[in-house]
Design a protein with these regions (language model features):
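Short glycine/serine/threonine-rich phosphate/pyrophosphate-binding segments
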Residues: 12-22, 45-46, 90-92, 112-120, ...
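C-terminal catalytic subdomain
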Residues: 256-270, 275-328
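Accessory alpha-helical/coil subdomains and C-terminal extensions
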Residues: 97, 105-110, 116-131, 151-283
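N-terminal phosphate-binding or glycine-rich loops at protein starts, especially the Walker A/P-loop
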Residues: 1-50
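Short glycine-rich or small-residue beta-strand-to-loop segments that form or flank ligand, phosphate
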Residues: 2-12, 72-78, 104-110, 136, ...
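Glycine-rich oxoanion-binding loops at beta->alpha junctions
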Residues: 48-104, 113-114, 141, 152-154, ...
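Single conserved hydrophobic/aromatic residue that forms the stacking wall/gate
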Residues: 350-359
């Protein structure tokens, strides 16, 4: 028998570590002949665009390099499977290609939308009595997947955000003139990444002085009042803002295949608003894609956990017969920090709202 693995959605510093975990654990099973990598997510399965990972991951050095390489080495996609009840043509193509290569288990590394694909494929296989296991491996820097304690990729992105904010804060203080620096951080529905900037306060750093999250109502009037109030105490005001806050700049009607709005420009919008109403020196900084794949500052814990959860997915399918589940973290203790890994019911994840901060 053979297995296949694919990556989907936005890249991270840790997603290839999960791929390495799948590969390493699958190699331990004598019954597995080939470990296929699907190029560009589920599209690679549909188009029969597969590579044999055993032909490229030959030495231990190859695998260690993969574990520490950012982005998605197999490529990604944002392809949305239709409901099989409406159109099952893609499901039939996937089934045919799995049969062609004797693939009996499929592992999909991704976020909310990838888990939607896992659930749909598993349901189709069950309804048609097809013995193929499908297991999801979580990935998202937004940290908004329900039920799991956190997601691989978030730790490294949060570390990048906090470190970059610390450097911006130091840069902003060199001049005597008043200034406002607005840093736009990713997070469409949840503000975990933006909130991670406040870890600097644990060491007595007051900045960022203002933090705005999509979980809270946003008022331009209150924002301007906040900036004026803080500027009376600090000459260099630092604002951390999530791209998903509800302001004029975020109300685009353009969406992707999954119905998600394209977000951009919140920082620039607030820069112009601040300049028009307050008049001090203002600049906005959009961290954009840089926060996703900052391997130079990746979290070792994040990389290790990403590997572990990829390996656990293989055991869930091949050792325990699990399918239609996503592997997730469960917090065991905070001090010392310990987490366990367990399968989570994808139907519960699918009907749940994104995990958001309680503010």
């Amino acid at each position: 028998m053979n297995i296949a693995v694919a990556q989907s959605g936005g890249p991270t510093a840790a997603i290839n570590s999960s791929l390495c975990g799948v590969f390493d654990e699958a190699e331990k099973y004598n019954e597995i002949d080939r470990i296929y990598g699907s190029l560009n997510g589920i599209e690679g399965i549909l188009n029969d665009n597969l590579i044999d990972l055993k032909e490229v991951l030959i030495t231990e050095n190859d695998k260690q390099l993969l574990k520490r390489t950012p982005s998605t080495v197999l490529g990604s996609c944002r392809f949305k499977l239709k409901n099989s009840s409406d159109d099952d043509s893609d499901y039939k193509r996937i089934t045919q290609n799995f049969a062609k290569h004797n693939i009996k288990a499929f592992f999909y590394i991704g976020g909310n939308d990838s888990m939607d694909t896992v659930m749909k494929l598993d349901a189709y296989f069950r309804e048609n009595h097809i013995d193929i296991k499908v297991v999801g491996v979580p990935k998202t820097i937004d940290n908004d997947l329900p039920l799991t304690d956190h997601t691989p990729g978030f730790g490294s992105a949060a570390k990048y955000v906090a470190t970059t904010l610390q450097e911006i804060i130091r840069d902003s203080r060199v001049y005597s003139i008043p200034s406002v620096t607005i840093v736009e951080i990713m997070g469409r529905d949840a503000g975990w990444l933006t909130a991670s900037s406040c870890v600097l306060r644990a060491n007595g750093e007051p900045a960022p002085h203002l933090i705005y999250l999509p979980e809270s109502d946003f008022s331009e009037e209150h924002y301007l009042e906040d900036v004026k109030r803080i500027s009376e105490r600090y000459k260099a005001v630092i604002v951390a803002v999530s791209e998903g806050i509800d302001c004029l700049a975020s109300r685009s009607e353009a969406t992707d295949a999954f119905g998600h709005k394209y977000l951009s420009g919140v920082g620039k919008y607030l820069e112009e608003l601040t300049r028009d109403h307050i008049g001090c020196k203002v600049r906005s900084i959009e961290l954009n894609v840089m926060q996703r794949c900052g391997s130079h500052i990746a979290s070792l814990t994040d990389l290790d956990e990403a590997w572990r959860i990829g390996a656990a997915a293989v055991n869930e399918a091949l050792k325990y017969g699990g399918s239609g589940v996503m592997m997730g973290f469960r917090r065991i203790s905070n001090n010392p920090y310990r987490v366990g890994i367990a399968p989570l019911d994808l139907s519960l994840i699918h009907i749940s709202e994104p995990t958001r901060l309680d503010v």
